[in-house]
């Protein structure tokens, strides 16, 4: 993906998020308060988890078209999570390149499971525990986001998209 394409995806997603959040809830994704960030990060994490299950089904059913559709859906939710975290476009798409593999399917399913675990980590990072502190470590949440983004790029690369 070129820098121009990344900017387009980021800006279009920002526009869509603000239109949806604005029309339905009177919110701007870049101006959410602490509680709203938590709520929407959890919403987008849950949606991403759902899309990961759909991607797994598409892979198992060898549905090439739907594999691409699900990856695009996942990308939109990941970009939305980055926007909630206050990341600029270049930060949203910045990652460390990962590994290459020869055992395609044996590698894909664990990557999907790892992505689901990272989504759970994101959810846990903003869910308050009754026994813990009542604050969110947003820097840790951004770190988990970077792991998720890196994992997503690896998954898309393995799928040849």
Locate predicted features.
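Flexible "arm" and connector segments at domain edges
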Residues: 1-161
